Amino acid sequence: MSKINLNKYKNVKRRIGKDWINLNPIQRGGVLPPESRETLQSFGDGYSTCDYCLEGRVDLVDSPPIDDLAGDIAKFVNMDEIMFTAGCRHAQWVALKALTEPGDVIVIDSLAHYTTYLAAENLDLEIREVPHNGYPDFELEVEDYADIIEEVEEKKGETPAVLFLTHVDYRYGNRINPEKVGKIAKKWKIPYFVNAAYTGGIMPIDGRRWKSDFIGFSGHKSWASSGPIGMLATSYEHSEKTFPKSEVKGPWSGRGFTKKIPQLFGCPPVFGAPIATLMSSFPHVYERVQNWDEHLENARWFVDKLEKIEDFRQIGQRPRKHTLMSI
């Protein structure tokens, strides 16, 4: 057996003190409350939630109430169904897999997360970008979605397969009105995906009002859970096609796995700490969202004070519409 220096892997700890405050804007939403740190200890073993699995999928476990959690989160964001995924990036891929064929065109905002681009690349899709106006605001004109749809239809003879909106981007924290894009999607009868990785769990979400067919969420970014974990919200209209059950059958053994979902690798890959902490943190997240207006005012106050320091300037939307910001 090869000799390996194992000492560097022992007693690995995060190099921050307990009295430190994490100000990283893309990490604040994923900070665990005290009760979830206890849950993390209890469910830290890899397959710990599988102790309770009788149905072959972690999302169907009823004690602890994982099945209830999916239903309650769906109500919380005003959508029909929630499925747990291996992060928002996985949620994007699952939805695009259901909605597209190789060579299809999708329209995305030019502030989209890199995982949106990679999901499209993985599925051999063509991308059209809605431009922004550059420094210092980096804002988009929602009406440009309609212009690009018309351009695609003229060139391809058909409309894009999906409209994709990043509710708040991770670089500048700009917030785009999802309802306005939703109206464009409905007018053209195009499926509509909202990436709410940095807003779900932070501020109020209303999928029906937005007219969204899909919403992607990130548990470890914005729902105070360990990771990786995400969620894909959808409507009953798209549910069956998005989460089809396995039909494979062993030609010799006859084995089948009829409760498994191929796009989720059989079972949502969130067993153990990710799903347990998401569940434990839900009351904390629910309360946090109720206080969104206060959090937003605090962010605006913070920007005002920082910009009184010489050479400090906030870039992106003014006034702030999200607590995530770039200075």
Kindly label every feature range from the protein language model.
Residues P25, S36-T39, F43-A98:
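Conserved N-terminal alpha-helix of the aminotransferase class I/II PLP-enzyme fold
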Residues C88-Q92, H113-Y114, Y135, A197-I202:
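Short acidic loop-to-helix transition motifs that present clustered carboxylates
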Residues V58-D62, G134-E139, H167-N174, T199-G201, ...:
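Short, small-residue-enriched loops and turns at beta-alpha junctions
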Residues D206-H220:
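Conserved active-site segment immediately N-terminal to the catalytic lysine
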Residues L99-Y114:
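Conserved PLP-anchoring active-site segment centered on the Schiff-base-forming lysine
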